[in-house]
Design a protein with these regions (language model features):
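Metabolite-binding pocket within alpha/beta catalytic cores that recognizes anionic/polar moieties
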Residues: 1-67
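Metal-dependent peptidase/peptidase-like ectodomains
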Residues: 57-96
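General beta-strand structural signal in soluble alpha/beta enzymes
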Residues: 19-23, 39, 90-96, 120-122, ...
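Zn-dependent metallopeptidase/amidohydrolase metal-coordination segment
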Residues: 122-151
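Active-site/ligand-binding-proximal alpha/beta "capping" segment
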Residues: 81-118
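Short acidic/polar active-site loop segments enriched in Thr and Asp
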Residues: 17, 118, 137
Length: 151
């Protein structure tokens, strides 16, 4: 987990203030289809861990960072406007991060759907948490590459 997030600490030290994250993931929402681009508006952390566990380094952020708005609204509006100008279809949704390397079971996918998840994958959530912790603005876009088991 720390290795995945390390580059974002370096980016912060280099002065980067905003990041765009992308991923390929499984669709849970039945209104989505493979090839759908989903603007991530929120996340659910089901990874069983958090990259901020451990001693806090105050140079980067507070001990208990706020995750109320993990994805920057201004960047989302810019992405929406740009997609509309270019005629690119997209959906908005909640991304659920799940620890791999196994894919989810059909029962897990049903549970995740009940929790409000639109898509599921094995990345993006730790990076989002670390970037928010450091005060970086985050935009994240998923490409639905397949429908999750049981959908």
């Amino acid at each position: 987990m720390k290795e995945v997030c390390y580059p974002f600490y370096v980016l912060k030290l280099l002065g980067v203030e905003q990041v765009v994250l992308t991923n390929a993931c499984g669709g849970i929402n039945r209104d989505f289809a493979p090839g759908t681009l989903m603007l991530i508006t929120d996340f659910i952390n089901m990874m069983g861990t958090n990259p901020l566990i451990g001693p806090n380094d105050e140079r980067f952020g507070p001990r208990f960072p706020d995750m109320t708005e993990p994805y920057n609204l201004e960047l989302q509006e810019l992405a929406k406007h740009t997609a509309e100008e270019m005629g690119i279809d997209y959906k908005e949704g909640t991304y659920l991060g799940f620890m791999g390397p196994c894919y989810e079971t059909a029962a897990e996918i049903r549970a995740f759907a009940g929790m409000g998840a639109d898509a599921v994958g094995m990345s993006t959530v730790p990076e989002t948490m670390v970037c928010n912790y450091m005060g970086m603005k985050v935009l994240a876009i998923s490409c639905i590459t397949n429908m999750a088991t049981g959908t």
